[in-house]
């Protein structure tokens, strides 16, 4: 089976569902409403308009006179506007910035489904084994779990759609600068696995560099996860030896150095802002009952935004069912399950503990 069908399904399913939501909510051109919400209305739309003018007229990329009495534009660009997709504004007609932002939001949701499906197909070797009678979900060679190739491929597509339509995307799709990292994260993780397993650094370096350039804030969280996933994945592929550590450190630093063109001037600006005075919490606190977090993975939960709220964990009720199946699956050895389950528990604690939350953010 070719990749095209499952990848197309992974792109089209969230795309169609998002369009149906737009029709239901009467979002233009299906009505007279728009997606402008909170900061998207007060900040992002004016910022996108300013970027469009600079791209079309060749204005200064370093400073803007249209923000108050004048303000630095580099740090604003680095956080809000650095997505490569935003450069499509140069082709977009003036006066239709809101429509551009709507299209961009929907496009990134669909692309998230595609990239996550591609990751699953590569991670579980679905595409490589599709020419055989069955695709193999490789745990260990002696205890491989076999699925028909078409089932494995389209199961990956459904998981990709669940990722694209998860509660986080439902809550923050209007935060356009964050969703690029949702698109790129699966590629970064796949690149890391190729780096460890096959000594192929290209995808890891390029995807991580673009991720950091697109939005350094979410990229911080991705980089923390990469350290954890590297340790876990390396323990499962020790044949790669300790040189994998050197490769991981080198190409991670190289990607960070690539992003430094925006990070360094932004760090200077942030050092002069009020946020620079925020310090590590002195006492440990728990935001809410950890057991109650399970409810955030259930059907029909409300999404939350803001600084103090329940985490948006829902990505389909079937995900919880699959977690229980994974725990009780005898084909997967406990020496492989325990580190992965420990990582899930660590995430669970991070959502509720103020110190871990501070580190992630």
Regions found by a protein language model. Name each.
Residues 14-18, 106-122, 145-148, 152-235, ...:
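Membrane-embedded helix bundles of polyisoprenyl
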Residues 24-123, 155-186, 214, 301-306:
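Active-site lumenal/periplasmic loops and adjacent helix-entry segments of GT-C-fold
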Residues 125-152:
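Intrinsically disordered, low-complexity terminal tails and inter-domain linkers enriched
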């Amino acid at each position: 089976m070719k990749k095209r069908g499952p990848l197309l399904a992974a792109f089209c399913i969230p795309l169609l569902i998002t369009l149906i939501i737009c029709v239901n909510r009467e979002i233009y051109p299906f009505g007279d409403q728009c997606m402008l919400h909170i900061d998207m209305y007060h900040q992002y739309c004016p910022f996108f308009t300013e970027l469009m003018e600079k791209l079309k007229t060749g204005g200064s990329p370093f400073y803007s006179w249209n923000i108050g009495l004048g303000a630095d534009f580099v740090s604003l660009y680095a956080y809000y506007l650095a997505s490569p997709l935003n450069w499509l504004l140069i082709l977009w007609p003036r006066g239709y910035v809101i429509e551009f932002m709507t299209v961009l939001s929907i496009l990134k949701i669909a692309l998230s489904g595609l990239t996550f499906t591609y990751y699953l197909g590569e991670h579980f070797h679905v595409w490589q084994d599709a020419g055989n009678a069955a695709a193999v979900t490789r745990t260990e060679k002696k205890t491989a779990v076999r699925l028909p190739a078409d089932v494995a491929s389209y199961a990956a597509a459904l998981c990709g759609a669940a990722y694209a339509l998860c509660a986080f995307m439902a809550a923050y799709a209007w935060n356009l600068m964050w969703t690029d990292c949702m698109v790129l994260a699966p590629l970064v993780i796949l690149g890391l696995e190729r780096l460890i397993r096959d000594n192929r650094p290209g995808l890891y370096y390029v995807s991580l560099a673009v991720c950091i350039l697109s939005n350094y804030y979410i990229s911080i969280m991705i980089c923390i996860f990469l350290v954890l996933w590297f340790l876990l994945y390396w323990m499962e592929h020790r044949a790669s030896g300790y040189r994998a550590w050197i490769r991981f450190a080198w190409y991670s630093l190289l990607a960070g150095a690539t992003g430094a063109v925006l990070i360094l001037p932004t760090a200077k600006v942030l050092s002069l802002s009020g946020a620079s005075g925020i310090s590590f919490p002195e006492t440990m606190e728990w935001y809410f009952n950890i057991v109650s977090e399970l409810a955030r993975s259930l059907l029909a939960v409300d999404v939350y935004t803001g600084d103090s709220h329940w985490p948006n964990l829902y990505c389909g009720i079937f995900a919880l069912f699959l977690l229980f199946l994974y725990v009780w699956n005898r084909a997967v050895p406990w020496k492989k399950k325990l580190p992965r389950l420990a990582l899930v528990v660590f995430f669970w604690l991070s959502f509720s503990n103020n110190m871990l939350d501070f580190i992630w953010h």
